[in-house]
């Protein structure tokens, strides 16, 4: 095994994500970072479909990011591993799994809009993972751009303590550059790609506000740095280096967010933003050691090359040339190509064929990876998103798993020709392996293939990829809502499966107490005493319930949030069997549906609508007609109206077209799953009747 010297010290690594609402200029920002760091030598524009990071045909046509593209750049002696994530709400899973393996992030805001609906979602995800962030207020040259208001929106809408470390010089078409509040110097830019800014004295008309803003910055970081607090109390000035160190310390708490400004498209302020990434975002050594489960114990994994190898697989992708690519983040140790690893999640041994350093969809083969690296492996057959990989000789442990939302929308698919059936099956298998929020199954009653995902665009992209990548033409049914079932009452139910007609019969008999188990999923409790049901049959009672819950008891939808306590029953020495107890348990659930108050649940979506003020009344009325509950309305600084509402998914099909026609093409909206709620009786009755489920 060849062990090479480490090229970059771990303290010089920055593993970061670029995250934002759709159209905030996130991918353009990433392109500029790659250009300035010498990773690419020509800039490709997203709106022209030429972006380096948006490499999928669907991304280039639609001008949006769908998958998380990974790349590595170098800046001032630091190695920056960058993941550019999607801004569209249907692809939130890509953001979720990227943030899980990153140490820091740049949140890109549109200077005119400030915080937008999807900004809230990705910000919340980053907060869950305690990811330190920098705020980059982009598009400062846009009409209506306002740096101060955009930063304030982080505080008011996200509760994030965002504080400017720069102040803008001009805005909209007059945007020229910024004042560096740490070093108290001004930079202006000519808009050329190289972004060689000119350092100038702070313009006289901005000296007063620059001093005020620097003092606000000092006051804000004083809460995190005692030395600065003492200097502030004594009325002394704070030197630049001390202030810089304090900003870094504050940022690493994930409670303080330095804000910078610029225009990525117009080549203004991006280099200073990369400097801020280096200066203020953490290395793998600055973040708390990751926790892992070792049996019943929680252990911490120290970020060091000297420890056993450990990594988390955070993305699986099908590549037409090399097969399955598994993206992983190394948390400890060293791994050479050709080595064996243990997938500790599945307890399987796997061989790493090749290790690739990725740049969007191009790649460079490398010999090894070390702590802090993000790379892709070729050759892993059983590893899926969220699995832990450890060295062959390491003591078994599992890094904390990722939890993904269940799909809320489904469609039936049929291959256009019989010849395409096998290709369809292969394509769906590969695509569901890549995306944990995409599910596919066969409807037992109709024999149709069903695909399920997070939204209409999500399923559109899946169908498009089947056509392009797997050569499968399909006929697509109308989108369907993924309802759920649950129980609302507690009852003790008997389940019997007894058949005795000569020869060996069947005998299973159970008494189960069923209770609602709100938001806790399925819970099975064994309270059998005195051997009334032999131990070996208990797990088959549980299995019978689980299998029945998958297909439901009302209308064929999964049954959720049930606690089942097996407390009595009986058995027969000869006729009892595993199957008999599975059937008896299943019957208990089916027979008890009336006593248990079985009911249908419908998915409720968070809907955020942005419209010109003139259309406010019409849109409010339309949302109410769709059974929407209005949660909040606001008028933005640019005069647009925003409406937040909770609306059943079943009422939102075709909304994009309806909104366009109601607002003459000037309205837009975002929608994301929020929760399941009891469906109104008339709707529930109609669905149950239509499904004719026995």
Curated annotation (Swiss-Prot):
The keyword Nucleotide-binding applies. Pfam families: EFG_C, EFG_III, EFG_IV, GTP_EFTU, GTP_EFTU_D2. PROSITE patterns: G_TR_1 (PS00301), G_TR_2 (PS51722). Residues 11-285 form the tr-type G domain. GO terms for biological process: ribosome disassembly. Keywords: Cytoplasm, Elongation factor, GTP-binding, Nucleotide-binding, Protein biosynthesis. One of its GO terms (molecular function) is GTP binding. GTP binds at residues 20-27, 84-88, 138-141. It is found in: Cytoplasm. SMART domains: EFG_C, EFG_IV. Its main location: cytoplasm. Gene3D superfamilies: 3.30.230.10, 3.30.70.240, Elongation Factor G (Translational Gtpase), domain 3, P-loop containing nucleotide triphosphate hydrolases, Translation factors. One of its GO terms (cellular component) is cytoplasm. Belongs to the TRAFAC class translation factor GTPase superfamily. Classic translation factor GTPase family. EF-G/EF-2 subfamily. Catalyzes the GTP-dependent ribosomal translocation step during translation elongation. During this step, the ribosome changes from the pre-translocational (PRE) to the post-translocational (POST) state as the newly formed A-site-bound peptidyl-tRNA and P-site-bound deacylated tRNA move to the P and E sites, respectively. Catalyzes the coordinated movement of the two tRNA molecules, the mRNA and conformational changes in the ribosome. This is Elongation factor G. It comes from Mycoplasma mobile (strain ATCC 43663 / 163K / NCTC 11711) (Mesomycoplasma mobile).
């Amino acid at each position: 095994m060849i062990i090479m010297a480490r090229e970059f010290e771990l303290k010089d690594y920055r593993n970061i994500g670029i995250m934002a609402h759709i159209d905030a200029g996130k991918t353009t920002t990433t392109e500029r970072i790659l250009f300035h760091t010498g990773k690419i030598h020509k800039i490709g524009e997203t709106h022209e479909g030429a972006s380096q990071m948006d490499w999928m045909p669907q991304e280039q046509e639609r001008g949006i990011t769908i998958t998380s593209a990974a790349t590595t750049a170098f800046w001032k002696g630091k190695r920056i591993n960058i993941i550019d994530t999607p801004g569209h709400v249907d692809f939130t899973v890509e953001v979720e799994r990227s943030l899980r393996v990153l140490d820091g992030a740049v949140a890109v805001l549109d200077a005119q809009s400030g915080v937008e609906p999807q900004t809230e979602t990705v910000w919340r995800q980053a907060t869950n993972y305690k990811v330190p962030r920098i705020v980059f207020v982009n598009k400062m040259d846009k009409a209506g751009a306002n740096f101060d208001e955009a930063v304030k929106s982080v505080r008011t809408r996200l509760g994030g303590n965002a504080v400017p470390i720069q102040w803008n010089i001009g805005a909209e078409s007059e945007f020229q550059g910024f004042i560096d509040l740490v070093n108290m110097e001004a930079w202006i830019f000519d808009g050329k790609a190289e972004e060689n800014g000119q350092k100038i004295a702070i313009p006289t008309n901005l000296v007063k506000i620059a001093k005020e803003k620097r003092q606000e910055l000092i006051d804000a970081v004083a809460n995190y740095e005692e030395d600065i607090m003492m200097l502030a109390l004594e009325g002394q000035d704070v030197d630049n280096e001390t202030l810089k160190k304090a900003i870094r310390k504050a940022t690493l708490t994930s409670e303080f967010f330095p804000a910078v400004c610029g225009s990525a498209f117009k080549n203004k302020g991006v280099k200073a933003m990369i400097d801020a990434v280096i200066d203020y975002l953490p290395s793998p050594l600055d973040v708390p050691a990751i926790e892992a489960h070792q049996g019943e114990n929680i252990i911490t994994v120290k970020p060091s090359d000297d420890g056993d190898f450990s990594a988390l697989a955070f993305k699986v992708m099908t590549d037409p040339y090399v097969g399955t690519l598994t993206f992983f983040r190394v948390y400890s140790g060293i791994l050479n190509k050709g080595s064996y690893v243990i997938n500790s999640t599945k307890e399987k041994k796997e061989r790493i064929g090749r290790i690739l350093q990725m740049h969007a969809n191009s790649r460079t083969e490398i010999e090894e990876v070390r702590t802090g690296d993000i790379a892709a492996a070729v050759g892993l057959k059983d590893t899926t998103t969220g699995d832990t990989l450890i060295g062959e000789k390491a003591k078994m442990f599992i890094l904390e798993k990722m939890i993904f939302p269940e799909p809320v929308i489904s469609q039936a698919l049929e291959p256009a020709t019989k010849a395409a059936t096998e290709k369809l099956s292969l394509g769906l298998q590969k695509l569901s392996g890549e995306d944990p929020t995409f599910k596919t199954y066969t409807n037992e009653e109709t024999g149709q293939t069903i695909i399920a995902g997070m939204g209409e665009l999500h399923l559109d992209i899946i169908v498009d990829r089947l056509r392009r990548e797997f050569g499968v033409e399909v006929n697509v049914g109308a989108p369907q809502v993924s309802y759920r079932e649950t129980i609302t009452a507690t009852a003790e139910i008997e389940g019997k499966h007894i058949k005795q007609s000569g020869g060996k019969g069947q005998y299973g008999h159970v008494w189960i107490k069923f209770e609602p188990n709100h938001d806790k999923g399925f819970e099975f409790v064994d309270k059998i005493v005195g051997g009334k049901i032999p131990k070996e049959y208990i797990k088959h009672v549980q299995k019978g319930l689980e299998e029945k819950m998958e297909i439901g008891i009302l209308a064929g939808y999964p049954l959720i949030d049930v606690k089942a306590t097996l407390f009595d029953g009986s058995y027969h020495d000869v006729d009892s069997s595993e199957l008999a107890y599975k059937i008896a348990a299943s019957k208990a659930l089916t027979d008890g549906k009336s006593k248990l108050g079985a009911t249908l649940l419908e998915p409720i979506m968070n809907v955020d609508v942005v419209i010109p003020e003139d259309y406010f009344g019409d849109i409010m009325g339309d949302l109410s007609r769709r059974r929407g509950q209005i949660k909040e309305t606001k008028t933005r600084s640019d005069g647009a109206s925003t409406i937040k509402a909770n609306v059943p998914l079943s009422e939102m099909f075709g909304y994009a077209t309806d909104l366009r026609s109601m607002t003459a093409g000037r309205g837009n909206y975002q929608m994301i799953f929020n929760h399941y709620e009891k469906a109104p009786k008339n709707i529930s009755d109609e669905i149950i009747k239509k499904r004719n489920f026995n």
